[in-house]
Amino acid sequence: MSQMLHIEIPNFGNTVLGCLNEQRLLGLYCDVSIVVKGQAFKAHRAVLAASSLYFRDLFSGNSKSAFELPGSVPPACFQQILSFCYTGRLTMTASEQLVVMYTAGFLQIQHIVERGTDLMFKVSSPHCDSQTAVIEDAGSEPQSPCNQLQPAAAAAAPYVVSPSVPIPLLTRVKHEAMELPPAGPGLAPKRPLETGPRDGVAVAAGAAVAAGTAPLKLPRVSYYGVPSLATLIPGIQQMPYPQGERTSPGASSLPTTDSPTSYHNEEDEEDDEAYDTMVEEQYGQMYIKASGSYAVQEKPEPVPLESRSCVLIRRDLVALPASLISQIGYRCHPKLYSEGDPGEKLELVAGSGVYITRGQLMNCHLCAGVKHKVLLRRLLATFFDRNTLANSCGTGIRSSTSDPSRKPLDSRVLNAVKLYCQNFAPSFKESEMNVIAADMCTNARRVRKRWLPKIKSMLPEGVEMYRTVMGSAAASVPLDPEFPPAAAQVFEQRIYAERRGDAATIVALRTDAVNVDLSAAANPAFDAGEEVDGAGSVIQEVAAPEPLPADGQSPPQPFEQGGGGPSRPQTPAAAARRPEGTYAGTL
């Protein structure tokens, strides 16, 4: 048997893209020209099609060498986005955020739209007593021709967004918000900054305070993922940002096109979306363990969705950009045309009682542009996460092969979304809306069913048996395909609980080999006619771990295959009790 040799070049993809970018700047081997207001930009078809769904559809079946974009696209903005397609980096000033996001939404570049929305609307730090500033570890990110930054240029340039590069390992420095008396010539301040020597971080602000050249009151504001943001943006408004709402996890899985060739693009974008979620979870736990200045639990609990680390820029007052208003007119929510707080709650339709934040509604319009079908998908994904869509039948129209236990989506929210879309596009028929809503539910079930066998194969041995025996509701709750990332910890706790439990339960566990049938016939949540695809993405949502029984409780009865009710709660009231539900009453 011959020996296999393996060769792997680190950052090979970044190196190739860097070489392609150099060729683009020199005008070598370019096979397409994009004309923006009379200015031609040379590029490579393959790179543009891989980065933008708009260009992929534009190049499909068209062999022309020059294409012209609409006049609403600014040339300088397109040049920045074109550079992003080759380098994965985007540099812009705070005043250019909305224009860049609108242009990226028109070109259907998901990474810029999603990460740009994070920069504007998401808030992070759940701590109230102290805030933290984050300094990026320069040695944690691999260097390549397309991601090297000179220190002098980084100090003078605006902040840099890197949507396609995983979040680097962060080092934490604690800043106390307190009044410091002025230090005399030979006196040190009462309480200098804690510099965290174990992390190897040198804080220049500490020396400035000691020298008496910096303000004596430290700002209570946290910046996540942006290196020394307060120094990169001199005029930044340093003020705390209140806790806001998070956009539904399903919002990032929807396409920004309504063309027939990409009508089912939810599955095509699952890989990118799931990779972003895995990176966020992985590096979030690394960030907690790397904090040397704070006491951390040995086994940290899963971080709630609303308190995950994200990027906080500043509390800007936002409104729709003028370039978008010139195309769609005044068909949006009337309050979007004036500046306001992104966290402000707006009633979607007057008298409906359905509320959405200004930031979420602006995100939907920036991604949709003039396309009313994309706007409907974005709004539905904002109000309903993927689990809710997968467990429902859309608008109440059920086929004979569908599971009758699936209930329609919340009618109050659905009617408000339909009415808002009809105000935006009067020609948008309700039958078309019903088809789109049902299609979103079908796609959510297809993605979940595709990954069920893969998730099952990833489980530790015996987890299915423990899930059917441990817990009071084990007989009625099947194995959730969205297996939590902390499954190893939960499994270890259950083993510990079993060792402390009754001996009869242990005998029952080890003698009665109970197997859980996870096929489509045994699980009514999936259509029997749907096929399991081979390729796909990792499921993004995670289910909360089941609570462990108390020490004083008697062990539950063994699992009986004949018992149990429906696999999932189906009513809106029951869905409101679930921690993963996105809509419960007034938004």
From Swiss-Prot:
Residues 245-263 have a biased composition (Polar residues). The keyword Protein biosynthesis does not apply. GO terms for cellular component: chromatin; mitochondrion; nucleolus; nucleus. It is found in: Nucleus. GO terms for molecular function: DNA-binding transcription factor activity, RNA polymerase II-specific; DNA-binding transcription repressor activity, RNA polymerase II-specific; histone deacetylase binding; protein homodimerization activity; protein-containing complex binding; RNA polymerase II cis-regulatory region sequence-specific DNA binding. PROSITE patterns: BEN (PS51457), BTB (PS50097). GO terms for biological process: negative regulation of cell population proliferation; negative regulation of DNA-templated transcription; negative regulation of transcription by RNA polymerase II; positive regulation of intrinsic apoptotic signaling pathway in response to DNA damage; protein homooligomerization; protein-containing complex localization; regulation of transcription by RNA polymerase II. Residues 30-94 form the BTB domain. Keywords: Isopeptide bond, Nucleus, Repressor, Transcription, Transcription regulation, Ubl conjugation. Residues 567-576 have a biased composition (Low complexity). There is a cross-link at K174, K217, K299, K429, K456 (Glycyl lysine isopeptide (Lys-Gly) (interchain with G-Cter in SUMO2)). Homooligomer; mediated by the BTB domain. Interacts with the NuRD complex. Interacts (via C-terminal part) with HDAC2. Interacts (via BTB domain) with MTA1, MTA2 and MTA3. This is Nucleus accumbens-associated protein 2. It comes from Homo sapiens (Human). The lineage of its organism: Eukaryota, Metazoa, Chordata, Craniata, Vertebrata. The gene is NACC2.
